[in-house]
Amino acid sequence: MTNKDNPKFHTISTEYIDYLREADSKVPFNKDEQHSRPYVGVLEKINGHDYFVPLTSRNDKNFNSQVSVKLFDNDEKRIGVLLVNNMIPVPEKECKEIDIAEKTAADPQYGNLMLKQYLFLKENMDRVTNKVEKVYKDVTVQGKPSHKQKFLKGVCCDFPKLEEKCQEYKERDQAKERDKARRIAYMRQMGRER
């Protein structure tokens, strides 16, 4: 998980992304395998879940500042956008940390972009965390929502629904692990009886 002094990039398994997309079409697709969409881990659990915020390098689109954090290099050139509205809860087993040095060795241009994004995030994680917490709170508010909250609910993933799906996925995965352990134990038992 990320800490304030060391933000980390992760990839999320396509299988898990596709699973969430069945429940909420606002969950962004993963990209190709060469440059799978990077996510930034949020500093602390939200409602008991580890949330990850997708990062895009697209600069040809205007992003609403209420639900995104724009990243800039030292020359004030936009180098990416965190899409807070599309953040998702992810089980630990479904995310993998990205090694920026490996990315740089494989694709220097992409690796250097990620390094610039990392440096920006390192200086601005408090701002990112505050935005994430505010958006989450506004989207999950109970009672009659304000105009802003209605807007946010319309452009953000359905966080409560995704949390349910995340929990179901974890439970399904645990059941698979138990079944696998039972099969292995059974096979060992059968081997001893021969």
UniProtKB/Swiss-Prot annotation:
Residues 171-194 are annotated as: Disordered. GO terms for biological process: plasmid maintenance. Keywords: Coiled coil, Endonuclease, Hydrolase, Nuclease, Plasmid, RNA-binding, Toxin-antitoxin system. Changing residue 57 to A: Overexpression no longer inhibits growth in E.coli. One of its GO terms (molecular function) is RNA binding. InterPro entries: ToxN/AbiQ_toxin, Type_III_TA_endoRNase. It holds the Pfam family ToxN_toxin. Residues 114-182 form a coiled coil. Residues 171-182 have a biased composition (Basic and acidic residues). Changing residue 31 to A: Overexpression no longer inhibits growth in E.coli. Changing residue 148 to A: Overexpression no longer inhibits growth in E.coli. Gene3D superfamilies: 3.10.129.130. The keyword Hydrolase applies. Its EC number is 3.1.-.-. One ToxN monomer binds to a 34-nt-long single repeat of the ToxI RNA; this complex forms a triangular heterohexameric complex with ToxN connected by the ToxI RNA to another toxin molecule. The ToxI repeats are cleavage products of their precursor. The ToxI repeat forms a pseudoknot which occludes the toxin active site. Belongs to the ToxN/AbiQ toxin family. Encoded on a conjugative plasmid that includes genes for a type IV secretion system. Toxic component of a type III toxin-antitoxin (TA) system. An endoribonuclease which cleaves between the first and second A of AAAAA sequences; it tolerates other nucleotides in positions +2 and +4 of the consensus. Digests cognate antitoxin RNA ToxI as shown by the 2'-3'-cyclic phosphate at the 3' end of the 34-nt repeats and probably other RNAs. Inhibits growth when expressed in E.coli without causing cell lysis; this bacteriostatic effect is neutralized by cognate RNA antitoxin ToxI, which has 2.9 nearly identical 34 nucleotide-long repeats. This is Endoribonuclease ToxN. The gene is toxN.
